[in-house]
């Protein structure tokens, strides 16, 4: 009898495979980093073949380390960095260009052009998104317009487009399945979140041939089987969700009004709004959460581009820490930020500002400023960006959050979690299993094959590790927030020229 579900978690900096038991516990993990390519300032690429090679390697490695064979795996769930765009040759399977990553800003001018054409309202109404270089649609257009011969091949039906889930499944099935799910499709700027299908008007606006697009499946259904070559036997692929939607599901935020924040490379807060798509009046995104047999669920989302990446910058860019976990002790060595505010707008500002020309800014620096103050200001910036989003979410949905569930690598940082509760003024709940992105993909896959019986069973499995209660005076909080808002204004529209 099958005892496990295997989650493939294809992230921005590494590919991972995580094996889960029926209790939702982790049996084994394998992880492999891959190359980040920065051809020009503001451009970020990945080698699509390296993405699949690392994903395939960790999949096999995870099972080997666990001493588990493929016949014990009931199904595979896939979750992935969203928006990152691959275009490949339908016949040979070869990418025509490196994958263009979600952080990449090269299509900012295409976005400006679309805004000038007065398309913002159409895009928001149909897709729930704002016009921004973040989403896949303009990246596909850029590849078709800039890779010699690509547009002609696309018109002839010879090219495929996919987000990373689609690319991984295409390769796992040796080109047999070209498929995505609604959560990923809803991040392309080509998909109508109300009809649940690709939108002809949007395809026309971005000049993308429909023949390139994958079919759109549910998030929890058997969509493919792996080619036996990979694991020695075919294993069903029965769960797909973009990383943030998967994390929402994995954190058991399955009912309307529940919210989670994932602290990874970026920071992503999602609020489950049930079966109703709320189009935001506060510059948040409306996105499909998941489409399962129980229905299509929507979320409000606020995206922060730089969260954990600010700690990587302290390590790799400034060299003030040797490893990411050191940041907590360094920040704790001072009682406060010493007046320093850091706005990590390295790739522009995400929600609710959506300023692609904002740049990183550090203010309040004096001769007395030390690396500890900068480290503390960096951690605080993660929590303060989250506060900006929560304020907007509460306005849009007309609710006051009772608590925020937190997941992702940076939740291990107790100082950050406590500071987050302090500035939000609501408790922050950290679950026992913080790998909720992979867990969400596992849940979606397991539900589709009867490994778990119901969403109620999943809700009951969620376990609390620690609850951080707000513990900051209103006066201190107000001063921090006031200085933060001033610093954000100074970071805006810097790169206009």
Swiss-Prot record:
Gene Ontology, cellular component aspect: cytosol
Enzyme category, top tier: transferase
NCBIfam families xrefs: glycerol_kin (TIGR01311), PRK00047.1 (NF000756)
Name of the gene encoding the protein in the UniProt record: glpK
Pathway(s) annotated for this protein in UniProt: Polyol metabolism; glycerol degradation via glycerol kinase pathway; sn-glycerol 3-phosphate from glycerol: step 1/1
InterPro entries found in the cross-reference section: ATPase_NBD, Carb_kinase_FGGY, Carb_kinase_FGGY_CS, FGGY_C, FGGY_N, Glycerol_kin
Organism expressing this protein natively: Oleidesulfovibrio alaskensis (strain ATCC BAA-1058 / DSM 17464 / G20) (Desulfovibrio alaskensis)
Name by which UniProt lists this protein: Glycerol kinase
UniProt: glycerol binding residues: 82-83, 134, 243-244
Residue stretches spanning the membrane: none
Binding locations of sn-glycerol 3-phosphate: 12, 82-83, 134, 243
The entry's keywords: ATP-binding, Glycerol metabolism, Kinase, Nucleotide-binding, Transferase
GO molecular function, one term: glycerol kinase activity
Record's keyword annotation contains Metal-binding: no
PANTHER family: GLYCEROL KINASE, SUGAR KINASE
């Amino acid at each position: 009898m099958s005892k496990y579900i295997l989650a493939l978690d294809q992230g921005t900096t590494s590919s991972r495979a995580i094996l889960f038991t029926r209790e939702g516990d982790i049996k084994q993990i394998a992880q492999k980093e891959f190359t980040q390519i920065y051809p020009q300032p503001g451009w970020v690429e990945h080698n699509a073949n390296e993405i699949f090679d690392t994903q395939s390697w960790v999949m096999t490695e995870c099972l080997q380390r666990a001493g588990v064979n493929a016949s014990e795996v009931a199904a595979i769930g896939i979750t992935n960095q969203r928006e990152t765009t691959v275009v490949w040759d339908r016949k040979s399977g070869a990418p025509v260009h490196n994958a263009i990553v979600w952080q990449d800003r090269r299509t900012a001018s295409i976005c400006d052009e679309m805004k000038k054409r007065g398309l913002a309202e159409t895009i928001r109404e149909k897709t729930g998104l704002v016009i921004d270089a973040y989403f896949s649609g303009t990246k596909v257009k850029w590849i078709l317009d800039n890779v010699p011969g690509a547009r002609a091949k696309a018109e002839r039906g010879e090219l495929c487009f996919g987000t990373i889930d689609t690319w991984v499944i295409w390769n796992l099935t040796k080109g047999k399945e070209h498929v995505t799910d609604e959560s990923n499709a809803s991040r392309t700027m080509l998909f109508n979140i109300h009809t649940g299908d690709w939108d002809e008007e949007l395809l026309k606006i971005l000049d993308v041939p429909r023949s390139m697009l994958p079919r759109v499946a549910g998030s929890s259904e058997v969509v493919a089987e792996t080619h036996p070559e990979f694991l020695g036997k075919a294993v069903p692929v029965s769960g797909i969700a973009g990383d943030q939607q998967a994390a929402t599901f994995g954190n058991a935020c399955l009912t309307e009004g529940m919210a989670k924040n994932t602290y990874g490379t970026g920071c992503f807060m999602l609020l489950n709004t049930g079966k109703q798509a709320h189009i935001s009046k506060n510059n948040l995104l409306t996105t499909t959460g998941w489409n399962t047999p129980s229905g299509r669920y929507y979320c409000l989302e606020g995206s922060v581009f730089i969260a954990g990446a600010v700690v990587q910058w302290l390590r790799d860019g400034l060299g003030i820490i040797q490893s990411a976990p050191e940041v907590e002790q360094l920040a704790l060595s001072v009682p406060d930020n010493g007046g320093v505010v850091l706005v990590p707008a390295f790739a522009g500002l995400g929600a609710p500002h959506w300023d692609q020309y904002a740049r990183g800014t550090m203010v309040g620096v004096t001769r007395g400023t030390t690396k500890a103050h900068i480290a503390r200001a960096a951690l605080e910036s993660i929590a303060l960006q989250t506060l900006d989003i929560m304020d907007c979410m509460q306005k849009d949905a007309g609710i006051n959050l009772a608590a925020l569930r937190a997941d992702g690598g940076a939740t291990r940082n107790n100082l950050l979690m406590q500071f987050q509760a302090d500035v939000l003024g609501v408790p922050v709940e950290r679950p026992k299993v913080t790998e909720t992105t992979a867990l969400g993909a596992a849940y979606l896959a397991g539900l589709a094959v009867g490994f778990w019986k119901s969403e109620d069973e999943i809700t009951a499995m969620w376990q609390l590790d620690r609850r951080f209660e707000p513990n900051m005076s209103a006066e201190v909080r107000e001063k921090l927030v006031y200085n933060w808002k001033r610093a954000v204004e100074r970071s805006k529209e810097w790169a206009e020229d």
